[in-house]
Amino acid sequence: MCALIPQKYKTTTFEETFDWTQENGFAGALEKCNGVGACRKVKEGAMCPSYQATLEEEHSTRGRANALRAAISGSLPFNEFSSERMYKVLDLCLECKSCKSECPSNVDMAKIKYEFLHNYYLSHKVPLRSKMIANIHKINSLSAGIFSVVVNIIVRSQ
């Protein structure tokens, strides 16, 4: 455990979707962030593009890890873990994995975000855009069939 984390530190457990064995659980993945702030680079490297654009701590890998850690450790109520506010903290993460390659602790915020989103959408509506992308194969088959006739008629009439 990181020296910055108090001995009495305990986390709320929940059913994890991904395999976090190497990280010693989801909490362990968050605890990899030791607060050094390499994710706050602005002049070189790719990490973290959303922080580089906003210069706001909450949009750095460290800020996101701290927010999630606060929710699962009891510093914030656990329901904050799947709140709209937490969604906004993670929303600008591009899932580019620069944090995993450039962070000295190899924090994988993309994987952390995927776990968060899975839990978030258990209690929130999945956006239409996400549903459409998840079902793009069905949409493509429709557009190649019925809709292609309609599109051809429209194109020929112009």
Residue spans of the language-model regions?
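Flexible inter-domain linker/hinge segments
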Residues: 1-49, 55-56, 63, 68-69, ...
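C-type cytochrome heme c attachment motif
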Residues: 32-35, 47-50, 92-102
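Cys/His-rich zinc-coordinating "finger/knuckle" motifs
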Residues: 40, 46, 55-58, 100-106, ...
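Generic long, charged, amphipathic alpha-helical segments
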Residues: 55, 59-86
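Iron-sulfur-cluster electron-transfer modules
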Residues: 77-158
